[in-house]
Amino acid sequence: MAAGRGRGGSTPFNVRGGRGRGQKGGRGSRRPTFEASRVAEAHHEGSSEDGSVHSGSDLDAEDQLEAPDESSPSSSDDEEDENKTEKPYNTLLQLFNAGQDAGGPARKRRKMDHNSKKVDVEVKGSDESDAEGLLLESEGEESSEGEEMEDMEDMPMDEVRTENSGDENDASDPFEIHFSNVDSTLLSQKIEAISSKGWQSHKSELPGKLRLMASQPNTEGHTIQVLPATQGVDNLKLKQKLANHAGDHISKFDSLASSLVPYMFGYQDLLFGARTLSNSAMFRDLYCLHALNHILKTRDRVLKNNSRLQKEPESDLELRDQGFTRPKVLIILPTRQACVRVMESISKLYQPEQQENKARFHETFSAADDKLWEHKPDDFRELFGGNDDDMFRLGLKFTRKTIKYFSQFYNSDIILASPLGLRMVMDKEDGKKQDFDFLSSIEIAIVDQADALLMQNWEHTEYVFAHLNLQPKESHGCDFSRVRNWYLDDQAKYVRQTLTFSSFITPEINALFSSRMQNTAGKIKATPTYEGAILDIPLPVPVKQTFSRFNSSSPVKDPENRFKYFTSTVLSSLIRSSTGRGGTPRASGTLIFIPSYLDFVRIRNYLATSSQTEHLSFGAISEYTSVRDVARARTHFFSGRHSVLLYTERTHHFRRYHIRGVKRIIMYGVPENPVFWGEVVGFLGLDPAGTAEAAEGGVRAMFSKWDALKMERIVGTKRLGNMLTEKGGDTFSFV
């Protein structure tokens, strides 16, 4: 059986969404710092080996990229609020001055021989069984015993030049344009336009009946340009190491990918609302390739500049090529098995000679599919197949020939995590130790399967984005003379690229697009044109599908207006159909589908206490109902003992039950996932003998104008307009 399915509730009291397997490594172990005028790290009593690092050229090239790990940096809420009122540059000066008196002996360097064969290396962390491991950055920190298998400083300089041949700086490279060759005046103009919501937009069509909306900051003299399609990886500005491998795994792009790749690799924000089982692997490979390309270009830029500073130690070179901390890419995923798929893409594109702790990664992250799920839908098996635990985090560190799993966050290049996994380490339970500085220098944020995250606890995702690219509270060994100016000016969130992939778009995802995706390079949104889920009903006979519109003046008042319409209009009809003469109960087989758990609780309590429903027998199944109570409710409903069954959308998402005995369906609101419409309506045909009767009972769904996004997926793009604005009536039927 796979690990327990995470079900982080949508209600505030449910913080956890699954079982965490965080493991403790060496919390006191020291981390090397940037080379040159770096801020010294305060000495920790529990530091490994000798404590600090070598200075100057004694640093190996990989260490020059790394910021030290503070074992338990913390700040009170009052301090956090106070910091928000200070100017960013003054804050950085205080951090810089605070670390000047720190020091310690140099760390011993360890050189190890290596061969050219691809091997997996296991490096065990200390105290892995300690429960505090849940609160550590990665699920098990790398040990100082597993020092680098390769030191670039041990390579002759001509070998370094050979490795980087063909990778010289290209002024037309989007990496150079977006991060290095930044016009500070133009950047400020774009940020000012974004802050005042001054976007200019252009709409166009994409292959596959998709609609594209491209937006750019509205600055004088700049207009939106529709980028030409890219046919294959040969047309991308890739590091040579990646180009060689990418061509073997990603040949030519299909028409959809060709249209979107220029924006992705051009560092524009992307909200893609048409993720499917057929295109998910392709887009996963593409965003992994983009992330690796960014990591390698950032790393090589720092190494080349380090070499320049070593050759000209007395020069006044100003080489700004870094952020505050090392992590540059954040990938947010719903489950551990999704993390395994991403790592498979990264490994095949990077082709490392060594992978440290790979076996341990597969042991703790991967699992076999449950054989009992063979009858489940394909999208269910993709999401919940294997290890479906939604409490995880993983740091990845890249060297020239190695991928190191379970590296500490401040020592990592890429962080892969679930929203809950990050929330647990960012916001400690004791409330005294908060640490999110490792998110201060994220330059690419990727959210895959955003629709699945909605069914966990979307508030965790919002919390993570609210803490991206904030000014750090600690120096973490940062060399401020190498930090890019837009970091120092607190403008990093306007340079960060965000890529979001979802099967459909909801108001919550739209809010993320509007408020958190503020890239000065621009942003695009790709959405499908829907035919409508009402056309794809798995029944042999036509089913009457009725939609009832109620008036709602605002989203805030919508829950109250919906409940009032249900109790005054829908419920009276329900009671008449489910009771006989004299108020005696009569089995009606009515299923009430409820998208929101809060609405479910309200309706359940009303049916249990209202005099209007005193003769109405009902059962209830929610995502929090025990297996035993679920079985009892289903049995009573099928036998007719309960004439009504309440059933939530999140229950269906996590379980995909087949409810028998359904003769009529009332939808308190249409589902977010259009696939659920056909599956729930399909309950009417589970008993072949009563299919005709059930089809006549049909479906009645309630909606308001605030359900426009959901309704578009259910009834189709063309039908939606009239249903929202029709003056002649508020009931619409389809057969």
From Swiss-Prot:
Protein's job: DEAD-box RNA helicase-like protein required for pre-18S rRNA processing, specifically at sites A0, A1, and A2.
Taxonomic lineage: Eukaryota, Fungi, Dikarya, Ascomycota, Pezizomycotina
PANTHER family: ORF PROTEIN-RELATED, U3 SMALL NUCLEOLAR RNA-ASSOCIATED PROTEIN 25 HOMOLOG
Keyword Ribosomal protein found: no
Cross-referenced Gene3D superfamilies: P-loop containing nucleotide triphosphate hydrolases
Organism in which the protein naturally occurs: Paracoccidioides brasiliensis (strain Pb03)
Family designation: Belongs to the UTP25 family.
Subunit comment: Component of the ribosomal small subunit (SSU) processome composed of at least 40 protein subunits and snoRNA U3.
Protein known as: U3 small nucleolar RNA-associated protein 25
UniProt-annotated location(s): Nucleus, Nucleolus
